[in-house]
Amino acid sequence: MNDAPSTVGMIIFMTALGLLPFIIVTMTAFLKISVVMFIIRNAIGLQQTPPTLVLYSIALILTVFVSLPLMEDISNRLSARPLDVSSLDKLQASANVVKEPVKAHLMRYAKPGEREFFLSATARIWPPATRANVKDDDFIILLPAFVSSELTRAFEIGFLLFLPFLVIDIIVSNILMAMGMMMVSPTLISLPLKLFLFVAVDGWSRLMHGLILSYG
């Protein structure tokens, strides 16, 4: 019987470990940062460079940097009240300690309009008994609102990043057509120009700085 708490704790730890990728992708800056990174790679025209693993690693590093205050807050709360898995009630009490900073984080970056939509959507797709006590600060509302808000911001940034590279593609294509060089692939000419532009404006630094400061 003495091994029961440790067994329960191990099960909870393994479950939390399995959910960690889901938590990182849906509750942190990783979602927006990774999407922007892939958009800029496609905008330049480099299909495999930087490699996908490198882009995910950059996104993860920047996510840790941005989320450090949140992680520190959670760590301090758990230090003040260590996680207790000896019973479900104590486990729930410990989880409530962590819940507040995470909820505040999601509230900060989830657009009010998205929260209102998902709250109103419950009236259309949930039965009355299920939606009776739902509020706009519940996780079931905050999480999809946060994901939708982050994706919207990511594509807004991606659109602005795409424009100058699109202009280069159009100019190069028109010049080649005017010169009668239709057999020459525009990518052969535009890719070095886009790389030069990105390097000349210190693209990676500016991109990462902007993504980090967007959470200020």
Regions found by a protein language model. Give the residues of each.
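Hydrophobic alpha-helical segments and their helix-loop boundaries in membrane
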Residues: 1-216
